[in-house]
């Protein structure tokens, strides 16, 4: 006898669903086993799982830090950091403390004053900004006038031997102490023949320039008590000192402390010299540079130590390795997406003047050409990543102060 249609349907349906239920159960069991196997394999092969599931690694606890002051020291990879901060300001609609009027820095080499910031004196004495990162000579009470109380302060240091070599080539014709000497080795062999202490500020790039940028006396004798007291000052004022030689590890640490996303801290190397404008110092010259810049040498040694101690406190070695690997991988992806030939170009090869960095002295400062044919959104992302310091500052200035005359960067066209 044939069962009524409805019963048969229900019966058939029931057995169908029972079979399907079994299949679904199997599916989840297999998936669970697979996941366990991957985790086991990752453990055995010392692979960080976040490398396999990148979206997991981009999770951060709590809101991002948005009040940030970066002391932009000279010739220390600071333009690359500035690019990161300007991008963050622009994409998060944050205000930046930019140089007033037609200026390109915040009063450097004079000690910073709040009135060097555009708009600091408008809207009453309480006007505060989110991001501050243009060159200035650090002067905490004045910086505090334009930055909120909960600002995160950080800076970056570089081995003074290489920092001095970079300065020498870049500021060769600008700094009196460097003007009349053929090489840095010759300068370091008898610095007092070229360095006139009474010229003060104009020679700041020639000796202990990071110490000077921090607001201290770059000609002070490196006496133990004095050095220790100033290092303590820096520790009190800054939450973090990064190290240019370990730039990627620095970005991992910075991102963690600021609770930013990975893409916020991925950057291309900016303001780098082409290989033919880098000179090498003899081993004796290197030792003399450490002696000549003894204050910077102490500064660098001290904060190189604290940097690694901080990294160890924040991340296990394996986690650090995997985060650095992820950062590099993402940089490679973005280079392939944005850059012509995925690499930097020297000044004569850069076709768009808006992307050509400011050139100084004998240095050939490299930049980038973008790939042709990028869609609008990708183009915007890529342009931001390769935009040199002066152009980016002028761009933000126009966005922030549309009624003011724009910064005149026509000289970059030459
Ligand atoms: N990501 C990264 N890692 C390591 N080093 C880097 C990085 N980005 C820039 N650089 C090097 O930093 C030098 C430029 O420093 P600044 O941008 O601070 O110079 S400036 O004071 O703003 O003119 C310049 O050094 P030299 O090439 O020796 O002159 C750059 O090569």
Give names to the regions the model predicted:
Residues 2-414:
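Membrane-interface amphipathic segments in extracytoplasmic regions
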């Amino acid at each position: 006898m044939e069962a009524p249609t409805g019963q048969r349907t229900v019966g058939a349906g029931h057995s169908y669903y029972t079979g399907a239920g079994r299949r679904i159960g199997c599916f989840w069991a297999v998936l669970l086993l697979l996941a366990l196997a991957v985790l086991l394999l990752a453990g055995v092969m010392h692979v960080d799982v976040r490398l396999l599931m990148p979206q997991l690694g981009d999770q951060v606890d709590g809101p991002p830090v948005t009040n940030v002051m970066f002391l932009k020291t000279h010739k220390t990879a600071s333009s690359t950091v500035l690019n990161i901060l300007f991008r963050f300001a622009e994409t998060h609609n944050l205000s930046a403390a930019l140089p007033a009027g037609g200026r390109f820095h915040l009063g450097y080499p004079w000690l910073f004053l709040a009135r060097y910031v555009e708009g600091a004196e408008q809207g009453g004495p309480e006007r505060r900004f989110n991001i501050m990162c243009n060159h200035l000579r650090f002067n905490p009470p004045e910086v505090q006038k334009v930055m909120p109380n909960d600002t995160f302060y950080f800076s970056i240091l570089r081995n003074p031997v290489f920092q001095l070599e970079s300065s020498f080539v870049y500021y060769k014709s600008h700094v009196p102490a460097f003007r009349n000497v053929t090489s840095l080795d010759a300068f370091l062999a008898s610095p007092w023949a070229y360095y006139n202490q009474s010229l003060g500020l104009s020679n700041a790039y020639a000796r202990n320039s990071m110490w000077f940028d921090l607001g201290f006396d770059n000609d002070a004798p490196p006496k133990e008590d004095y050095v220790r007291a100033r290092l303590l000052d820096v520790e009190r004022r800054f939450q973090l000192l990064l190290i240019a030689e370990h730039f990627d590890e620095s970005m991992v640490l910075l991102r963690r402390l600021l609770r930013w996303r990975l893409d916020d801290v991925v950057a291309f190397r900016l303001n780098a010299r082409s290989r033919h404008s880098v000179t090498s110092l003899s081993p004796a010259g290197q030792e003399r540079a450490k002696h000549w810049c003894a204050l910077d040498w102490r500064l660098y040694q001290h904060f190189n130590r604290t940097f690694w101690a901080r990294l160890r406190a924040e991340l296990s070695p394996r986690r650090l390795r995997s985060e650095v690997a992820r950062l590099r991988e993402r940089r490679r992806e973005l280079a392939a997406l944005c850059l012509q030939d995925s690499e930097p170009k020297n000044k004569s090869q850069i076709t768009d003047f808006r992307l050509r960095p400011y050139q100084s002295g004998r240095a050939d400062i490299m930049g980038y050409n973008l790939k042709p044919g990028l869609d609008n959104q990708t183009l915007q992302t890529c342009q931001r990543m390769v935009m040199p310091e002066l152009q980016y500052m002028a761009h933000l200035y126009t966005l922030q102060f549309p009624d003011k005359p724009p910064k005149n960067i026509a000289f970059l066209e030459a």
